[in-house]
Amino acid sequence: SSQDVQRPVCIIGLGLIGGSLLRDLVASKHAVYGYNHSTSGARSAIKAGYDVTDDMPAILARAEADDALIVIATPMNAVDSVLNQIEEHAPSCGITDVVSVKTEVRELFLKRGMES
């Protein structure tokens, strides 16, 4: 729907894939913001003009308030922790991922009853 096209995007993990997605969405003038675990990485992104933080609870609370689509772009070993944070701070947001493996991510979603 047109509402989904306008929906802000919150990217969790700003490495190669998440960072590329953030830059492309900014370039297309889409509302996007992100989280990076590394404080220095977050600072670098902020200096480059991107809307980024290293405070996951705050960015997820913002995503919840904005009804944002959350994109998980972290290494597989961080997904469980990220999902725990999403359950706590952004339980009504839509979620997708760009993690390189799918079966394990799906199992983590199913374990929480988060499938759609």
PLM segments and residue spans:
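Short, charged, surface-exposed secondary-structure boundary motifs
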Residues: 44, 64, 104-108
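NAD(P)+-binding Rossmann beta1-loop-alpha1 motif at the extreme N-terminus of oxidoreductases
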Residues: 1-54
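Rossmann-like NAD(P)-binding element
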Residues: 56-96
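Short, solvent-exposed coil/turn elements at secondary-structure transition points
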Residues: 38, 56-58, 101
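Rossmann-like NAD(P)(H) cofactor-binding subdomain of soluble oxidoreductases
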Residues: 82-116
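Conserved short alpha-helix immediately C-terminal to the canonical SAM/SAH-binding motif I
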Residues: 40-41, 78, 102-105
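Alpha-helix C-cap/termination motif
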Residues: 28, 48, 66, 88-89, ...
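Conserved residues at beta->alpha junctions
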Residues: 36, 73-74, 99-100
